Amino acid sequence: MAPSAKATAAKKAVVKGTNGKKALKVRTSATFRLPKTLKLARAPKYASKAVPHYNRLDSYKVIEQPITSETAMKKVEDGNILVFQVSMKANKYQIKKAVKELYEVDVLKVNTLVRPNGTKKAYVRLTADYDALDIANRIGYI
């Protein structure tokens, strides 16, 4: 009966021994870089703050007031766009979320600009299923 492949491989390994010659790795750079090691995610025993801070910029702080100038009214009538004065700290995502939350409408896009007097203005374009004129009436600035 012929020995199995596994047995012959084991025999060769025993004959060869464990002190074989290790192939040296060729280093191409003079700088030694430490290998990346496993970094586990932190699992703190307690929170670093006892009480989390309240929401600094809620929907009512994001949208300060609607702008009712003639040009803003033209945007409402012609472009399905509502115009608001918003907080300087608010970004487009926060403005979109605040309009959706306060006025129950879907927002297509938000354009913002910082005015020379130091306030931020937001042009909020509504989706086709909502009429900006109706929303402006509901808000009460027409």
UniProtKB/Swiss-Prot annotation:
Protein function: Component of the ribosome, a large ribonucleoprotein complex responsible for the synthesis of proteins in the cell. The small ribosomal subunit (SSU) binds messenger RNAs (mRNAs) and translates the encoded message by selecting cognate aminoacyl-transfer RNA (tRNA) molecules. The large subunit (LSU) contains the ribosomal catalytic site termed the peptidyl transferase center (PTC), which catalyzes the formation of peptide bonds, thereby polymerizing the amino acids delivered by tRNAs into a polypeptide chain.
Cellular compartments per GO CC: cytosol; cytosolic large ribosomal subunit; preribosome, large subunit precursor
Cross-link (Glycyl lysine isopeptide (Lys-Gly) (interchain with G-Cter in SUMO)): K61
Pfam families documented for this protein: Ribosomal_L23, Ribosomal_L23eN
Similarity comment: Belongs to the universal ribosomal protein uL23 family.
Name this protein carries in UniProt: Large ribosomal subunit protein uL23
Superkingdom of this protein's organism: Eukaryota
Subcellular location: Cytoplasm
GO biological process: cytoplasmic translation; ribosomal large subunit assembly
GO terms assigned for molecular function: RNA binding; rRNA binding; structural constituent of ribosome
Self-association state and partner proteins as the record states: Component of the large ribosomal subunit (LSU). Mature yeast ribosomes consist of a small (40S) and a large (60S) subunit. The 40S small subunit contains 1 molecule of ribosomal RNA (18S rRNA) and 33 different proteins (encoded by 57 genes). The large 60S subunit contains 3 rRNA molecules (25S, 5.8S and 5S rRNA) and 46 different proteins (encoded by 81 genes). uL23 is associated with the polypeptide exit tunnel.
Keywords of this entry: Cytoplasm, Isopeptide bond, Ribonucleoprotein, Ribosomal protein, RNA-binding, rRNA-binding, Ubl conjugation
